[in-house]
Regions:
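Sequence termini and other peripheral, non-core segments
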Residues: 1-144
Length: 144
């Protein structure tokens, strides 16, 4: 389980992007129903207000609309109800989703590009899109 840096959402390959919806939804439902998450890579979400996870979902859903021209209205309602009036933010998980975390995400995505097999592999074109996105976000070329 992993939450990609919210800044990478517009640049993720379709496979990684669509998989992110399953991750966000599973995290929200575990937190809501079990009052906890149980995965090393995402447990930090609980250090933030629930509104940050809802904000992440809303940023995801905007990008989803840009890509596929539809939205997740029922799921959006579920997220808003989950956050129970917490404030939303345009930069969710501030302090965690920083440049260092962005680089960790890029390294993980590079591994999927370089070592990936079959459908899970990130193609050269998809990798270039991620590198271009990294440069847009940071103003720097991505270096491994």
């Amino acid at each position: 389980m992993r939450l990609w840096s919210w800044q990478l959402l517009p640049y993720l390959s379709d496979l990684q992007f669509k998989g992110q919806l399953r991750e966000i939804t599973a995290i929200m439902r575990d937190w809501r129903d079990k009052e906890t998450t149980n995965h090393l890579l995402i447990n930090r979400v609980m250090d933030y207000p629930k509104g940050d996870l809802t904000s992440y979902f809303l940023l995801y859903d905007i990008e989803y609309g840009n890509r596929y021209h539809k939205q997740h209205c029922e799921l959006a309602t579920e997220f808003v109800n989950f956050s129970k009036g917490d404030h939303f933010t345009v930069e969710p998980f501030k302090g965690w989703h920083n440049k260092e975390y962005l680089r960790v995400c890029m390294a993980n995505l590079y591994e999927k590009h370089f070592f990936g097999i079959g459908k899970s592999r990130i193609t050269d074109e998809e990798w270039q899109r991620l590198c271009d996105g990294y440069k847009t976000i940071t103003g720097e070329e991505y270096k491994i």
